[in-house]
Amino acid sequence: MAQYYTTMNLKSRFAPSPTGYLHLGNARTALFAWLAARGAGGTFILRLEDTDQQRSPEIYERALLEDLRWFGIDWDEGPDRGGDHGPYRQMERLAVYGRYYAHLQSSGQAYACYCSADDLAAERAVQRSAGKAPRYGGRCRHLDAAARAEREAAGLLPTLRFRVPDQGTLTVPDLVWGERHYALADLGDFVIRRSDGSPAFFFANAVDDALMEVNLVLRGEDHLTNTPRQILILQALGLPVPAYGHLPLLLGADGQPLSKRYGAASLRDLRKDGYLAAALRNYLARLGHHYSATGFLDSRALAQGFALNQISRAPSHFDMVQLQHWQHEAVQSLDDAAVWNWLAPLLRGKVPMGLEMPFVAAVRANILLPGDALDWAERCFGAPALAADAVEAITGVSPEFWSVAQATLQASGGDYRRWTKALQQASGRRGKALFMPLRAALTGLTHGPELAALLPLIGEERALARLHAAARRPSTPIETTL
Ligand SMILES: Nc1ncnc2c1ncn2[C@@H]1O[C@H](COP(=O)(O)OP(=O)(O)OP(=O)(O)O)[C@@H](O)[C@H]1O
Ligand SMILES: [Zn+2]
């Protein structure tokens, strides 16, 4: 397969249009391209394809850079930091495209087309009714200078079309899909410059990759059919052709590809919800790429384990359960101080000063998102609501049990082991029968972190008050032991 880079000079890129907030599909495509570059010690660049001016307000550009950085992707060249092959915003490169248009026109490989949208629609309708695939029939291919001048004088603004060779087959290698063959006669001459002077996607994208010395293009499968046209443009201009790999699109729950246009869940939404970038990286890196390591990997290990031949062709679906699995792993990979930094914006003022680290140590295995930690802070330091099964666990034991629980707690000076040992001896309860009602009364839940770690946070005073409140609930006498 054509592949002219060695791992030493590999250069890949992410080239989004700043037309909305990045979604997980964009993020995964960016991640694969970045992992390929970083894994090979190559170069990674960011280029903004902002030629759709109506849909590219500045807020999206800023958000895009911010989201990528948060996600953990860095770039060696880009709109914010420049580089040897800039500028990195396509709207700043119009003069560059102009030179290449002129070259194609003067060598006869591109020509002005004056057909109106109505003309083209009519042509397509005829082709369709004849059972043919619609393509440009070449009406303006052979206009002479006089005919062109006449149309210009009438005020018609032409598009510029690429002249596709009439015969032959183009072989397009793809790192994911293998080789595909295209009959050139089927392609039809295509627009490379719109009538308003703006570059067509195919053109600017292909020219920029070549001029920026990108030799590996990993992008979404939505661009698969653009590739033959792009290779034709590059060949006509004598520019190098990169290796292409098209990644299966990430689909939403409705089975449709995620798209900025249709408001797919964005990276920034997940960030706001408290998902960690490392969780998203581990999740997305494995979505359509096989790693032999099944555990949590840091960015360096993800890059080292990345291999183009491990990319799958199967479509991938966004799966919240998988994301939560990696979120759990990512939280556990942090040390206590880092967990606190992550929680602090939501928890400041909710955890008494000095108890931050013991609190983190106690609850960290039980939290996926900062909201979970907020709930545990309320259960430790506030007034926890009792869940229905906790009420059941509390009322399932006699009021005497609760009196003894209070007395033994006081006698043990708040020491968890001494307390529960004494209570076990006095009540005859052990194991779950002992700990479940205690947990229910102290936290309002029947599950959660180790009680031994929670008790010092709750403190003796609050614990006594909660045991006292438990004693005041009418018991459902199902047992006679204390
Ligand atoms: N659902 C998806 N799954 C994987 N990659 C995607 C998906 N959608 C887009 N991409 C890829 O993300 C990169 C950036 O694309 P682009 O900025 O055009 O995003 P988009 O979501 O297609 O936006 P729009 O809806 O504005 O077309 C491209 O390589 C594109 O192929
Ligand atoms: Zn025409």
Swiss-Prot record:
One of its GO terms (cellular component) is cytosol. Its EC number is 6.1.1.17. ATP binds at K260. InterPro entries: aa-tRNA-synth_I_cd-bd, aa-tRNA-synth_I_codon-bd_sub2, aa-tRNA-synth_I_CS, aa_tRNA-synth_I_cd-bd_sf, Glu-tRNA-ligase_bac/mito, Glu/Gln-tRNA-synth, Glu/Gln-tRNA-synth_Ib_cat-dom, GluQ/Sye. Its cofactor is Zn(2+). Signal peptide: none annotated. NCBIfam families: gltX_bact. It comes from Acidithiobacillus ferrooxidans (strain ATCC 53993 / BNL-5-31) (Leptospirillum ferrooxidans (ATCC 53993)). Keywords: Aminoacyl-tRNA synthetase, ATP-binding, Cytoplasm, Ligase, Metal-binding, Nucleotide-binding, Protein biosynthesis, Zinc. This is Glutamate--tRNA ligase 2. The keyword Hydrolase does not apply. Catalyzes the attachment of glutamate to tRNA(Glu) in a two-step reaction: glutamate is first activated by ATP to form Glu-AMP and then transferred to the acceptor end of tRNA(Glu).
